[in-house]
């Protein structure tokens, strides 16, 4: 089953990348501090035409030994469509697959490709059968901005939403 082997190989690669990212993220520069989640909240508290924010934006800052991370998130709804906007600070331990070469993969289930959003490296993924898409952006080699949409027909929804965000201003928080 060639398709099964290809899927298994992709899963193994994803696991390997994930594990290397976790190990890499545990090494924190001496004296470095994550941005407190309260500074990230305004970037997810956005007005999206046609969408309603569910509740209030929320966030967390965790510091335990050498592990430090901050995140802020906002959830939105428009009919049967849902959207989550997440910003994470891992002290520069951003998305590992964005540091390499250009990527483009298309199968009957999904499309994955590297791109640029507001001048920052990004990866977009769309699962057409599930009507689910993701846009992952590395901002200033410090922040991971993730837009996750469910019930969407294409990635244009996410691309339009990210235009409501001031990623260049977020980049100024990278000390």
Model-derived features: where do they sit?
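Charge-dense, low-complexity intrinsically disordered segments
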Residues: 26, 38, 152
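Bacterial N-terminal signal peptides that target proteins for export
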Residues: 1-18
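C-terminal segment of classical bacterial N-terminal signal peptides
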Residues: 21-29
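Short, solvent-exposed recognition patches
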Residues: 34-128, 132
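A short, solvent-exposed beta-edge/loop patch
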Residues: 77, 82, 105-175
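Generic anion/oxyanion-binding catalytic loop in active/binding sites
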Residues: 21, 40, 147
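N-terminal non-cleavable signal-anchor helices
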Residues: 7-9, 28-31
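Short glycine-centered, acidic/aromatic-flanked micro-motifs in structured strand/loop junctions
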Residues: 11, 25, 149
